């Protein structure tokens, strides 16, 4: 068996996000990384191969983000993301972008500058913890993954366990991913991620899932 891997550098462009997932501790600082900050992170990652761009979904619905983008000559946050993808390529790192739910034309734009894209399915069923998170609608997430397949974009996805789903929900969610992979052949990685309670979130007192299960 041959196991391959690539070192990556984590680039959290912003923690502004339209979703309010009950387990998430990502939205802390309400900040945006500047181009200079991104460049510094990329330059420090001299031994990395991949730049992992992550950020909150649809960040540009917030007025403060719109203002920040306008001051720098960008119309949308996706425009800024693509510019940072281009910077990464110029500095010799392969971009991988986790952008949340995307339209087909947005995937096309990202495809040009990314080695791969990613979106965790999390669960293929509706859950209480996503009640205030329109971007976690499983139908919309599945549609994004399928559209990436139609566009032949290498893709990473996976499930998040311990967030209120039943055992058969996990099995069903993995089956959904397997079916998409069979149909389009673009899924390169499937992550099985465990829920970890985070202080200050509605689910801070939930027990994490048993690793043996």
Question: What spans do the regions from the language model cover?
Answer:
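Short secondary-structure boundary segments
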Residues: 1-6, 55-56, 60-67, 131, ...
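A structural micro-motif
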Residues: 3, 93, 153, 185-188
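Short loop/turn motifs enriched for small/polar and acidic residues
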Residues: 8-10, 14, 54-56, 100, ...
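Short, solvent-exposed polar/charged micro-motifs at secondary-structure junctions
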Residues: 13-17, 107-108, 200-202
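Conserved Radical SAM active-site core
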Residues: 29-158, 163-172, 176-179
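Auxiliary Fe-S-binding modules of radical SAM enzymes
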Residues: 91, 171-213
